[in-house]
């Protein structure tokens, strides 16, 4: 058997063994995709014992390409929500998550200086302790750029594997410990979160209001201050028994009922100006109007603003809200449409059908992947990651590398959505498949390279010490920030658990947090809020630590 055939066969075996290990769960908690790393270590040990020779060049290419696939698909997935998560609504959560990253970096630096841990080893421990595989890839690349021998670079994968298991278990232990310390009642926390979300959250709500302000009588909607912007949309108007779709020129009268869509604070302001909320239904049932959700799949409308499509003027149809990547938005007239946007349309059936034809509304297209944008994005990401940034006093130029470059480019492209007929939307199933393939390839190679000396290091070497160092890097930041978030910020426990899981980019921890109260979405929401920024910081941090430690000796 040729070296290439043998290498592919061994990688397939690693994937099978590793995925089997990852699927084994104890009380609902397992290693997940991290099991591939340990599958690689097991197979790598026996490959070394048998004296087999694998193609080192092929392993290197597969490792790097797997990492690129993984970080690129992550960026495409979270790109639409990344910049939104940095705004005020998620600012507090992101600040606490950033604090966890900073404290973790400080603990790593202290351990490195106190115990004189070799640079590749301490970076591997850091990456494993925070269960972040792209950090491992970024750290290995910067070490190679600094001229570190390959044997030392491979030690990073071994120390990563030592610290990884407690990285998984440590966050679960922290959640449990914080629950005991603060005597948390999970049911109460879930109710409080739901109450806060309903009353003051930044979610999109609807309300029916009667026009009671005499100053608004015979005034066009476009002349009513609260309705002439993009914060509140009036999607239906009922006068006596007639329900209609209003336009900006529609004149309102005292006693009219308006169906408004917007965020709670803006709807409250509308009540103050227009009149009181009423229980009267403005449902389209029994009328010649209907409400329908339509998906944007026509390349010809991508990038166009809602106002430029003139749906109200041409078809008498109003867009009441927009769902983008799972986030509900007010359909501002300045919003540019992206592939996969889901629009709530209100109008007559024939008019809605006409608008649907303009927008596309071809569900089958959502299951198709445009491969050209995928490779354009990956190519641009690799180029971005290869740009050197020279910092005075540093021994090597800083680069985003093959982990950071594709991630940043994917975040940007995911946010842009489309350029002409090229769109960077990727169906969730396709995104997940490519992401899982990438991480399996990467971890398989890392495990294979670490397997030869793993048992010796664990039994006769410093493996146990590395596990202890990793436990500190995992636990100290989580416990510190958890206590601060609960005591000072009075953060909801379920929200805090999601934030802690997101700060470690740890899906098993999110699954554990979700199971604390399966019907509450608090943990998942906070996890998604901090995940994009933290993933970026986790990739950059080992590079900064490597250059810092290298420069100060």
Swiss-Prot record:
Gene3D superfamilies: Regulator of K+ conductance, C-terminal domain (3.30.70.1450). The keyword Magnesium does not apply. NCBIfam families: PRK03818.1, YidE_YbjL_dupl. This is Putative transport protein YidE. One of its GO terms (molecular function) is monoatomic cation transmembrane transporter activity. One of its GO terms (cellular component) is plasma membrane. It is found in: Cell membrane. Keywords: Cell membrane, Membrane, Repeat, Transmembrane, Transmembrane helix, Transport. Residues 191-276, 279-361 form the RCK C-terminal domain. It comes from Escherichia coli O127:H6 (strain E2348/69 / EPEC). InterPro entries: AAE_transporter (IPR050144), RCK_C (IPR006037), RCK_C_sf (IPR036721), Transpt_YidE_put (IPR023018), YidE_YbjL (IPR006512). Belongs to the AAE transporter (TC 2.A.81) family. YidE subfamily. The lineage of its organism: Bacteria, Pseudomonadati, Pseudomonadota, Gammaproteobacteria, Enterobacterales. GO terms for biological process: potassium ion transport. It is a multi-pass membrane protein.
């Amino acid at each position: 058997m040729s070296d290439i055939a043998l290498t592919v066969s061994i990688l397939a075996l690693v994937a099978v063994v590793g995925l089997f290990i990852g699927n084994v769960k104890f009380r609902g908690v397992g290693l997940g995709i991290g099991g591939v790393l340990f599958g690689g270590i097991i197979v790598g040990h026996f490959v070394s014992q048998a004296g087999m020779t694998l193609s080192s060049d092929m392993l290197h290419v597969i490792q790097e390409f797997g990492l690129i696939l993984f970080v690129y698909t992550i960026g495409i997935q979270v790109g639409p929500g990344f910049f939104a998560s940095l705004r005020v609504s998620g600012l507090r959560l992101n600040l606490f998550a950033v604090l966890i990253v900073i404290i973790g970096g400080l603990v790593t630096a202290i351990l490195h200086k106190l115990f004189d841990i070799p640079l590749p080893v301490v970076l591997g421990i850091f990456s494993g302790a925070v269960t972040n595989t792209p950090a491992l890839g970024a750290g290995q690349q910067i070490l190679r750029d600094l001229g570190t021998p390959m044997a030392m670079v491979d030690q990073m994968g071994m120390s990563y594997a030592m610290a990884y298991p407690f990285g998984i278990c440590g966050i679960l232990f922290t959640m449990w410990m914080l629950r005991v310390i603060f005597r948390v009642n999970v049911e109460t926390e879930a109710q409080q979160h739901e109450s806060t979300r309903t009353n003051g959250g930044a979610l999109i709500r609807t309300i029916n209001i009667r026009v009671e302000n005499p100053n608004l009588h015979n005034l066009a909607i476009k002349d009513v201050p609260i309705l002439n912007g993009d914060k509140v949309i009036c999607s239906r108007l009922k006068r006596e028994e007639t329900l209609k779709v209003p336009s900006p020129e529609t004149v309102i009268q005292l006693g009219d009922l308006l169906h408004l869509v917007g965020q709670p604070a803006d709807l409250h302001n509308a009540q103050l100006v227009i009149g009181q909320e009423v229980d009267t239904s403005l449902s389209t049932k029994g009328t010649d109007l209907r409400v329908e959700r339509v998906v944007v799949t026509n390349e010809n409308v991508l990038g166009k603003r809602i106002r430029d499509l003139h749906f109200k003027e041409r078809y008498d149809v109003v867009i009441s809200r927009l769902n983008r990547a799972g986030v509900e938005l007010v359909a501002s007239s300045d919003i540019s449409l992206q592939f996969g946007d889901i629009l709530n349309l209100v109008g007559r059936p024939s008019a809605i059908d006409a608008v649907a034809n303009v927008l596309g509304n071809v569900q089958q297209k959502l299951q198709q992947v445009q491969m050209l944008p995928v490779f354009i994005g990956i190519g641009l990401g690799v180029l971005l990651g290869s740009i050197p940034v020279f910092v005075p006093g540093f021994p090597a130029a800083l680069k985003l590398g093959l982990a950071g470059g594709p991630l940043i480019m994917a975040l940007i492209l995911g946010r842009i959505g489309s350029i002409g007929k090229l769109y960077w939307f990727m169906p969730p199933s396709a995104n997940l498949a490519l992401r899982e393939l990438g991480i399996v390839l990467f971890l398989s190679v890392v495990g294979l390279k670490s397997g030869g000396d793993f048992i010796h290091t664990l039994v006769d070497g410093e493996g146990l010490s590395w596990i202890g160092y990793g436990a500190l890097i995992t636990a100290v930041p989580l416990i510190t920030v958890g206590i601060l978030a609960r005591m000072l910020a009075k953060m909801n426990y379920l929200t805090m658990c999601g934030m802690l899981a997101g700060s470690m980019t740890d899906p098993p921890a999110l699954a554990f947090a979700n199971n604390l109260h399966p019907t509450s979405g608090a943990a998942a929401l906070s996890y998604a809020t901090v995940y994009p920024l933290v993933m970026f910081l986790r990739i950059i941090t080992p590079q900064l630590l490597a250059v810092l430690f290298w420069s100060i000796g």
